Curated annotation (Swiss-Prot):
Region (Interaction with large tegument protein): 463-899
InterPro entries found in the cross-reference section: Herpes_U30 (IPR007611), HSV_ITP (IPR034738)
Pfam families: Herpes_U30
Name of the featured protein: Inner tegument protein
Domain of life: Viruses
Regions that span the bilayer: none
Amino acid sequence: MSVKPLTELTKNLEAASNELLKTKVLMDMELNYLSIEQLESAQNITDFLNILKQTSSQYSTFIHQHFLFYLLKLSTFSTLNYDLESIKQYMNILNNVCDVATTIHATSSSNFLNNQTVINHIKQYITSNATFTGLSEPIVPNNVISTFRCVEEVVHVCFQCYWHFPFQAQIPQIPNGALEKWLLTQHFKFLNLDYTAFNSLKDQATYLITHEKHLFVPLSSSEYSLTLPLAKNQALNIYTSFTTNTITKSNVPVLAFSAKELTDATPELFFLYDFIIEALYHEHSYNVPQNIIEQFISKNTQFMTDLCNTIQIKCSNKSLTSSEIRHIKELLESCGLTEECCHRLQTSVLISNVSFTSNSWKGYETFISLISQLVLFSDFFYKCLFYFSPTSIGHSKITEILNTVSAIESETLSHANKFSWKLANMLSFFIPKAPSKIILETYTHISPYLMKSAFSIWAKKTWNYTWLDATSPHPTQTHTFKHAPVISQSEVQKYCENLQLGTTEYDSRIVNSHLFAEEFITHHIIPTLTAILQNKVQKNRALFQLRWLIVFASDEAKGLYRIRRPLGLLYFQIIEIFHDSNAAAAAILNVLDYLNEIQQLIQYYVPTYTTPIKFIQELFSIKYKPQSTELSKSIQKFIAETETCVKDILPFIQLGTNMCNTTYYHIENTYNINIQGQSPARLDTKALTHAIKAIQGLTKESWTTISQSYKELQTAYIQLATILETIEKISQHSIAIKVSNPNFIKLNNTFLQCFKKYNTIANLITNSHSFNLTRYFRQIFEPELIPITTVQKILNFNDETDDPQPFLDSLSQPLYSHTNAPKKSELTSEDFNRLLEFANPVFETAPSSIKLHYSDTFNTPQVNINWKTYEHTTYIADSPAELQFTHLTSAILDAELSK
């Protein structure tokens, strides 16, 4: 819906040459917004009312008498911010509009909607919110102004401000170790909590860099630039706090961990350790013993299980108070599961698949599944919380979010989210309830059926409220025509036959007849509507004709009220589809419902009438073809990116497979490698380990790109799932239309094929040798079971003077179980050449930066110059020699050379 200034509405009304065109302007405005800032001008409102006086329809008269209700119902603020200063500005604007309206006189027959009542309600709302600070729950008006767009916007931003409340829960303040202290201090700073009890961030960063050097691993950027971005960012934060100099991210190592950090980590602060989650997700253990990793997994799995149980109990209620919602938010934030943490884990870690079958850590699958479940829940919890308010704005936004959740949990995408939770059900407490009483009262006090139709569409679109038509009283024929003059049917029939489409003048005597409705329906509504629905009329002409059917003799032709109500709804819905690319998902379904109601009313007079569908078919295409095009582009993009990445990754997979099926002979720091048709090649251990890391890293980088593309495809499929749900309802409607163009069923099958291909590719890549190359060559990366120095000490052991502890420490290292090696083959010369490309990097690590420090002191004896002796700054010889110059020509040069 677009925003228009009141001056433009006034200008369009003034330009309209007849009653019908003026009504069109007012009707079209019902589907747009007005800029509320223009209502602060009395002149703008007065000009609008003066032009409105020139029309005499019931519709325009009602607007003139209740102009504040009409204008504020459609008014919106130009910008919306959820800070206290902005909220005060919005209140001031509302107050100014009320002050201006007070100076403009208008008579009204409705106490519920009259201008003074509206002014009183708004003034009362402004007064009640005068002390709003964002700490207490905002006040919500419980009267007609809650249906005004501008008032809903103020209520909504107040709630947005309220949900950004200061954190008040308790967090463990005794960290275990220097690293946890750093993470906790960072967390306190992010939550705007007092962290003065800890050392400054600079002091902590200095301590970590100087005393905990084992935490910083200078891995190559090609290996971990994509697979460990969180560890990189954590290290960057520490280095940034350590120095004020500019830090180059590519030169910063990644933040790692040892057995001590895993043992000391507090489970209640688990999600502060996002870099550990990232490392374990990608199975980087940094040589920490398996039993230590499994203990870490076990204690944090227990913590997450308890957290899940608490959340599930709290979300089991269909409605929660604000304090209960606040408590869930604090529960998540206290363990580090903030909105930003969810985003980091979603985009950097959980986006890629993880293989549970190849991992040997006990409890690993449950551990990762709980992380995924909590992150997904928290992500959508924060999204819902941001939009949560008891307004139609909140209802629309949250319904859209939960539809997305339902699509994610559909059978198609559930393979990636095998959770026991149904998030859409758990988060349903966020959906605000419609203010039914206020909507019904407002609808009842609106007298023009055109405005009733527009209000009904608003209630259905914003609140999904569909009870208005069922509960609204309609005038009966007995009551309406009790005092109508007796006119013969032939006279009414002749009048309708001669009535020209588009005329605005009418015979009151005839249109008040109880026979007029049947004849008007027979001679005008049926043929006009049939021509429109057969798509025989140009679009603008069709809208004009439909509008005329609605407004002709609208003030007196009471017998047409029942059929004009769905005609009005149909008109507004068609306008929305034509002019709004983001029209409601159920727009076509609404059109079918309105046409079905019109058909039933017509069949009362003409039982054989059926609704043509050609025009509806075109509406279906207008509504859904752009979406079909965008979804097709998403598929094409996924296929293109995946094909490119697979093409790039296949050589690595082939090389990794060949490497794992080749025999290696280790001699000191060198490996002999069998080459087909050649003598064995030699490669030093350092070069081989670098090649292994590089091949695995590049494989994972390509896989991360595929996973990112798949994530985008999932997002597109969520949109398709919502469309398919609506189209399913359309296909089952009593007015049957074809839903095969655009063919979303075919599109859905294409998506499913892409998902199937992705799963196949995922299994092939994640279970390939190159993806897990460091695991296959883990012996190279493991520490020696018994170092050479220890062996030498054993050989030269002296019972009296030597300590046996080094030997005992070596024996205490766990022995990893290795599978039997498969039958070995040999590398081809091409394979070995490619291996050498990765084994000999130009720069293995980034060079250390050279830092020079200067002062005003000399590091050599000061130079003393006797300026009385040295009177000149240039050298002057004591006895200048006389220099003789000869002009050299080519002739002289030739003569000299010929001598």
